[in-house]
């Protein structure tokens, strides 16, 4: 069964995340300026500070919720996906899959252009029904216990 889904992360969850980021034991990380041993220390500190003090999660929620979000269960896995339907009566589905460590947010700016080209100087007949799933364990899809039974055809049943 496919059901509508609205992304709404409770303020208490966000506050808990911010608290964990603020209290991270930075002294445990070796202060190496380069990227040879992983993420650059200064970059990581800077982006962490940005995330807890300036990033607007609710603005992001509004952006992703401007699309039709859904959840469905496939073989016991709750999969989240975005579906943006074109006004093209002969539209074909276009499946966009993110990789690791990506997510559906990589496609948020291109979804409307693919589904509604007429709004960007194109023709309605060029529009696709765009489907963008959050792969299992990413975004708002639940992780699997084992990936052995999970195949692309299983995900494509969405």
Predicted feature locations:
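Conserved alpha/beta-hydrolase
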Residues: 118-140
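Conserved small/polar residues in nucleotide/adenosyl-binding loops
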Residues: 148-154
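A generic "structured core" feature
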Residues: 84, 95, 131-132, 143-144
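Alpha/beta-hydrolase
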Residues: 97, 133-135, 152
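Short beta-strand element of the alpha/beta-hydrolase
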Residues: 91-99
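Short substrate-entry loop that stabilizes the transition state in hydrolases
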Residues: 101-107, 117
């Amino acid at each position: 069964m496919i059901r509508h889904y609205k992304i709404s992360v409770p303020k208490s969850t966000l506050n808990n995340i911010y608290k964990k980021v603020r209290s991270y034991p930075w002294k445990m990380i070796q202060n190496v300026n380069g990227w040879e041993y992983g993420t650059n220390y200064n970059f990581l500190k800077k982006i962490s500070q940005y995330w807890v003090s300036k990033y607007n999660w609710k603005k992001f929620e509004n952006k992703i919720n401007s699309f039709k979000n859904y959840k469905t269960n496939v073989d016991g896995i709750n999969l989240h996906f975005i579906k943006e339907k074109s006004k093209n009566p002969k539209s074909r589905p276009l499946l966009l899959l993110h990789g690791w460590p990506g997510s559906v947010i990589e496609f948020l700016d291109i979804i409307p252009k693919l589904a509604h080209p007429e709004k960007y100087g194109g023709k309605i007949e060029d529009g696709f029904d765009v489907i963008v799933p959050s792969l299992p364990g990413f975004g708002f899809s639940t992780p699997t216990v084992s990936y052995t039974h999970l195949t692309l055809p299983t995900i494509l049943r969405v």
